[in-house]
């Protein structure tokens, strides 16, 4: 009886979790919105509504904003016009909250998650071949004392350095060619670099 109850609970959990995932069409639109929002942080500078500005913070912010309703109020608050925008996504209320309920480990969820926990508990490993990356996927490096995320934008890579000054907002954009020839080899995304762990994709996206 007990085993049957546990199996039922696990089945219900899987059904609920699966129902909150984005389907293929939703995932494609999410990626376009995610990339656009990340691009705006580079073009305009970080939004004042983006708290905890670091590499993982960029992913959290872009994901959360991508899942919102992009009405006129949202456009104004993000400094965007209604021209050249991606199609709007049709999402359930639960799906719109996906980036507010990150798995933080130890059975906890919330709007904040570190880079390592974003990878460990909220993403799936894709591989170490950059050609496998889709726009919005994360490029993950582990330097021992610190972990770092970069975002594949489709044609280039962006990231936040984790620090900012009055003259430097911390946002960076580099081409894949630049990264592959980086003088500091710890940041080269190929399998010969032990610090490069791989390409990761958010769990709620369809593969």
Q: What are these model-derived regions, one by one?
A:
Residues 17-113:
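N-terminal capping segments
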Residues 57-61, 149-152, 157-160, 173-177:
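Active-site scaffold segments
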Residues 12-15:
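N-terminal signal peptide c-region/cleavage motif recognized by signal peptidases
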Residues 161-163, 170-207:
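Low-complexity, Gly/Ser/Thr/Pro-rich intrinsically disordered linker/tail segments
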